[in-house]
Amino acid sequence: MDSLKDHFLIAMPSLDDTFFERSVIYICEHDQKGAMGLMVNRPIGVEVEDLLEQMELYLSPEFVFSLDSQVLIGGPVAPERGFVLHTPQQHWVNSTEISEDTMLTSSRDILASIGSDKSPENFVVALGYSGWSKDQLEQEIADNTWLTIKATPELLFNVEPEQMWLMATQQLGFDIWQMSSQVGHA
């Protein structure tokens, strides 16, 4: 299977009543060792501004009014670790370029920049991540657990988390509710 890096996983309706119900996961890394991604549509119920205050990182007064972003649950693994998906900028301590439109940073310095003139233009803050061991994600896709689409900055950064699953499924070109989760063989 080709790498799914810079793609979205879209949870099939059969995942209802699970941790990943109606989730959209942005794949940050996918290779022969496994995969890592961030769920980008499940708010924790904490605003980024409040998270920054808890970390004793305070916003400049002129930016407080413009910061309206929710902290998301990135996944069930390492929920105490923070990750920021953002538009590219090169001056962070621990950043990885995922695509020409997206970088992943896990260092505190990017959080300190949010709400300042050094902040990335677009960003998503998540706690925890979703991970798959070697061949696990490929098997889940073969089992019709996930559908995939190429990620777009528009969907990643400009759609409200609560609307993302529906918007992502609409990009598939068919009604996801008409799909069967059963795998058939002719």
From Swiss-Prot:
Name of one Pfam family that matches: DUF179
TM segment ranges: none
A cellular component annotation (GO) from this entry: cytosol
Signal peptide (UniProt feature, chain positions): none
Disulfides per UniProt: none
SUPFAM superfamilies hit by this protein: VC0467-like
InterPro entries: AlgH-like
PANTHER family named among the record's database cross-references: UNCHARACTERIZED PROTEIN YQGE (PTHR30327), UPF0301 PROTEIN YQGE (PTHR30327:SF1)
Family statement: Belongs to the UPF0301 (AlgH) family.
Full protein name: UPF0301 protein Sfri_2850
Species whose genome carries this gene: Shewanella frigidimarina (strain NCIMB 400)
